[in-house]
UniProtKB/Swiss-Prot annotation:
Name this polypeptide is given: Hemagglutinin component HA-70 type D
Keyword Lipid metabolism: no
Anything else known: This protein can also be encoded on a prophage.
UniProt source species: Clostridium botulinum D phage (Clostridium botulinum D bacteriophage)
Taxon lineage: Viruses, Duplodnaviria, Heunggongvirae, Uroviricota, Caudoviricetes
Main location: secreted
Length: 623
């Protein structure tokens, strides 16, 4: 563009020149729906005879998605582009994706119909303000979609086409003035939304899971603020149908990535864990398509806005009730459509500051949590299905290191699983998606599935415990053994239970000791999820003679809970539970109960709040 045309454009621009802004430079979004005063924006017309339907449209590709710059002495093209893309939209990336749009309308039974198609643009400005006056303005027009003006005519009638050939740029929708001041000390740089290191918020309510890596699907329908993901807007006139179509080549769309720790959670590492958890096709070459269609009624015009959307995933390193590290991964999804009454071009323009950068979710909420095995930890295999009674000798080569043991069972049932001497505590997971998948000739064939679903277990290093779990034949399970010394344990013990201890299935039974003295005893355990159970096994001090007893009470503090007290007995069929008492409300309960000396009891609490459970036992006296 020649300098004379630039000067002519600048001097005749009738944009807003008086603003209530402090002195400085600003980047401004002036809205969508601009038609330029350039003949090559007119795409031609379509004529329909009486009663026929006319369809006009266009597919905008990279070669036709040309932005138009109007720089000034102070604001060159690079300065304009970088400031606009940093605040509002990465239109360079958007131009890689084709966008289709079309309009259709039926001619009246007694008239012909002429539809003329034009491109529309989103207008951005860089302005210099001095004493509430715009003293310099550079303009950028970024391709949006299009507009079809329809005119009904009688045979032989001359059509007034002045609307199409304008000497000034004009907005067929309501103009905007969304601004952000440009810092004087900052040099605009090329936008890079796809890989950022940020101070992510890692505060979160305690999760009902042990320490480890977790991938969370947070749902679909995420869009960036400030219309960064706007595809474009259609103005649809009365009795006209409009549609927006976008064929999506996923290998031309880029994810958005943020991390709190680029050393630990790089984009490559995060993508690998997402693939472990959900087998996500992050970069495939298949073409997806979405299309939105809307028809305006006979009494008003409407506008239809289309947006690109993202599906959000989080990778977290969860340690001791806190998120130590976090990465957010926004995977390109499809799109979203918003339809409203068409705004009036004569409506007042309001100066509005930009929103804070971020995301809004417009789709349904999700919170699907999947554990993934840390690739730095070892995996051992019990290659054949375990029988009803089985002892596994932990290889000495993996002692002193945390590891996972992959196994399956020969018979569906409820199993008691514990380490030798009930230490260290164990955690058991189901291998997600592994049912009947990697068994060959009754033998595990591989351990490539690294997605795991927590069943039960605890991280407490000094808590004696065992697992009661319901296991299904042909499903794969992992037991995680924490870092241990060779002097602590060298065996895992499996036993299928035939008694009614199966009522405790899929819970951890914490073994309590130090009840030899009177007074109050506190035990804190991280709870499983709401609706599940946490169990405690205690043996009453003293010799068993079926007569002597001690007085106890059971209560919780800061947590409400429903509990059941069982006596644990053993028979040839295994362990059995005898119900002693049901508690409807354990919060600050002080009701005493007499328990036999030397007998073993299990106290099971139903989790009604997600938190650490503080179980309190009051031992009073022998009776």
């Amino acid at each position: 563009m020649s300098l004379s045309i630039k000067e002519l454009y600048y001097t005749k621009d009738k944009s807003i020149n008086n603003v209530n802004l402090a002195d400085g430079n600003y980047v401004v979004n002036r809205g969508d729906g601009w038609i330029l005063s350039r003949q090559n924006q007119n795409l031609g017309g379509n004529i329909s005879n009486n009663g026929c339907t006319a369809i006009v449209g266009d597919l905008r590709i990279r070669e036709t998605a040309t932005p138009y710059y109007y720089p000034t002495a102070s604001f060159n093209e690079e300065y304009i582009r970088n400031n606009v893309q940093n605040v509002f939209a990465n239109f360079t990336e958007a131009s890689e994706i084709p966008i289709g749009f079309e309009f259709s309308k039926t001619a009246p039974s007694n008239k012909g119909l002429y539809m003329y198609l034009q491109y529309t643009y989103i207008r951005y400005e860089i302005i210099k303000v001095l004493r509430n006056t715009v003293i310099e303005r550079a303009v950028l027009y970024v391709p949006s979609l299009g507009y079809a003006k329809s005119i009904e005519f009688n045979s032989g009638e001359q059509i007034d086409k002045n609307f199409y050939f304008t000497s000034e740029d004009k907005c067929i929708l309501n103009e905007k003035f969304i601004y952000k001041k440009i810092a004087e000390t900052t040099t605009a740089k090329e936008s890079n939304d796809s890989n950022n290191t940020t101070n992510l918020n890692t505060s979160q309510t305690i999760l009902p899971y042990p320490n480890g890596l977790y991938v969370i699907n947070k749902g679909d329908g995420y869009m960036r603020t400030n219309d960064k993901d706007l595809i474009g807007t259609l103005l649809i006139e009365t009795n006209t149908s409009g549609s927006i179509i976008q064929p999506r080549l996923r290998n031309t769309t880029r994810p958005l990535f943020n991390t709190s720790n680029p050393t630990l959670f790089s984009q490559e590492y995060t993508e690998a864990r997402l693939n472990d958890a959900f087998n996500i096709q992050l970069f495939n070459t298949s073409t997806t398509l979405f299309k939105f269609v809307e028809e305006a009624p006979d009494n008003k015009n409407i506008s239809m806005k289309a947006y690109n959307t993202y599906e959000k995933y989080e990778l977290i390193n969860y340690q001791n009730g806190n998120i130590a590290d976090k990465a957010e991964y926004y995977l390109p999804s499809l799109g979203k459509c918003e339809v409203s009454d068409a705004p009036s071009p004569q409506a007042p323009v309001v100066e509005t500051p930009v929103e804070q950068d971020g995301f809004i979710q417009t789709g349904p909420n999700e919170n699907i949590i999947v554990g993934v095995i840390n690739p730095s930890e070892n995996i051992e295999e019990i290659s054949t299905p375990i029988p009803d009674d089985y002892t596994y000798n932990i290889p000495t080569s993996i002692q002193n290191n945390a590891c996972y043991v992959l196994f399956t069972v020969n018979t569906t049932g409820v199993y008691k699983i514990n380490a030798q001497n009930n230490l260290p505590p164990l955690i058991i997971y189901e291998s997600i998606g592994s049912d009947n998948m990697n068994i060959q000739s009754n033998t595990l064939s591989n351990n490539n599935i690294k997605a795991i679903n927590y069943i039960t277990g605890t991280d407490s290093s000094n808590a004696e415990s065992y697992l009661i779990v319901s296991l299904i034949k042909n499903k794969n399970y992992y037991i995680r053994i924490p870092q241990i010394s060779s002097s602590t344990t060298n065996q895992l013990i499996f036993k299928r239970e035939l008694g009614n201890i199966s009522d405790l299935a899929n819970s951890t039974v914490n073994i309590l000791d130090n009840l030899n003295t009177s007074g109050t005893h506190y035990y804190t355990r991280q709870s499983p999820d709401v609706g599940n159970y946490i169990s405690y096994q205690l043996t009453i001090p003293g010799d068993f003679n079926n007569i002597a007893s001690s007085i106890f009470s059971f209560r919780t503090r800061n947590n409400q809970g429903i509990g059941t007290l069982y006596r644990l007995t053993e028979s040839i069929n295994g362990y059995n539970l005898i119900t002693i008492k049901n508690y409807s409300d354990l919060l600050n309960n002080v009701e005493p109960i007499s328990l036999l000396n030397g007998a073993t009891y299990i106290f099971r609490v139903k989790v009604t709040e997600l938190n650490n459970y503080n179980i309190i036992f009051d031992a009073y006296r022998n009776s």
